[in-house]
Amino acid sequence: MSALKGPILVLLGSLCFSTTGLMQVLAPQGANAVSTAFFRMAVGSICLFIWCFFTGQLRFDWKTLPWKRLIACALCLTEAQVFFFSSVKDVGVAVGTVVYIGVAPCAAAIFAFLLYRKKPSTVWWLSTALAITGVVLMNDLSAGRLGDMSALGFIVAAGFGYALYVTISPVLLERLSAEASIAIISSLVSLALLPAALCMPMQWVLSPMGLFTVFDLGIVTAGLAFTLVLNGLKQTDSTVASTLLLGEPLGAVGWGVLLLGEQIGFIGYCGMTMVFFSIVLLCWEQHRRSKTQDC
């Protein structure tokens, strides 16, 4: 069971991420991508700093922290959010989501090989292809559009940015707890987004639904989600984790059906089944490898 702890934590993190779309739907009129991303990271960092303070996880020398790695992780997340949110409207939500989610595992495999000379297994290639196909079916791209190709390029760049973050962030756990790492990274991302956020309308935050949206995004999809994923990366390869994160659109579809009354057809259910089996396949591979190493 211990071999599955890492993948399970990554999956739980992806389920937390999956509520992002739900909150954007429920957000009051006037909410925009930049200010939403800013408040998400700012609230997440504040909550995590409070948690780390009361649990004694801030007892370290700030001068000796791996600032280069922390800043690199923050830049990756900032780039991913800015590029994705600024371009997704031009290519369509369905196409943008599939490209972003689909690029990340392949990019993670490239970065893992370039940085650590790690090669993904045959099972990983099979499960990743199965999951990406499932995500495509869930989003019903037959009705989609590619839109501006330059915007599509930004979506691809966003996927590479997030994949690089997943690849390089586990090193931080050698010096910091996952909670402290995400608290610092989230604060750096929110500072980077602050200038752009100040140019956007923020009145929507003051409404009851606006406050609920901000706190849910900050606590669940930033503080809790990133912490779960980073803890999971202790025992899970970045390439495997990036594919497990394809559970996010599976969760998003589930929330839409259960809470928003959205309808999906037979093809959509086939896509959900494919993503589910790709996750089961990866977990089985992780368990098999662990038993082989123990022997």
For the regions a protein language model found, what residue spans apply to each?
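Glycine-/small-residue-enriched transmembrane alpha-helix faces in small-molecule transporters
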Residues: 1-38, 44, 72-75, 79-83, ...
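Hydrophobic alpha-helical transmembrane segments of multi-pass integral membrane proteins
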Residues: 4-9, 35-50, 124-130, 150-157, ...
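Helix-helix packing/entry segments at the starts of transmembrane helices
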Residues: 15, 39, 96-103, 168-190, ...
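Specific transmembrane alpha-helical segments of multi-pass solute transporters/efflux pumps
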Residues: 21, 55-96, 100, 137, ...
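Hydrophobic/aromatic residues within transmembrane alpha-helices
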Residues: 27, 36, 40, 87, ...
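Hydrophobic transmembrane alpha-helices of multi-pass small-molecule transport proteins
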Residues: 48, 120-140, 193, 255, ...
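C-terminal transmembrane-helix exit sites in multi-pass transporters
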Residues: 51-55, 104-126, 250-269
